[in-house]
């Protein structure tokens, strides 16, 4: 096992033709109740929108999965989440979503960093999953 096997550092960016405040609201929606899988089915996610707030999947009937906690929320420019996410093994994740007002709209930057005993399949598919999130946010505002 090498250090590369134990770490993940992924960045994705999208420019959205919408006001930064509207983009931030869509980010909160898509990371919470509006979270979907690529096939359109709901993820049943809850995002408590305050520092220390939980970010979790509520499957109903007392079944759920803690994905993380809100580390930083600074509307309309920054959301940081940290925790195990979907990884049910020894790993820690940090998600940083930054928004910058640009000419004609907003630049949304997502950075996902993780370390631990990372599953190779998770590392391979994570870019596709985050692209779905960013595409969904862009679609919300088009």
Residue ranges and their predicted role:
Residues 11-12, 18, 29-66, 76:
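Short beta-edge strand/loop motif at the mouth of beta-sheet-based domains
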Residues 1-11:
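Short acidic N-proximal helix/loop "leader" segments that mark the beginning
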Residues 27, 83, 130-131:
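Tryptophan-centric aromatic hotspots in well-structured domains and transmembrane helices
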Residues 45-46, 56, 60-103, 113-116:
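Hydrophobic-ligand binding "helix-grip"
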Residues 114-142:
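A conserved amphipathic terminal alpha-helix motif
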Residues 28-29, 135:
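Solvent-exposed alpha-helix faces
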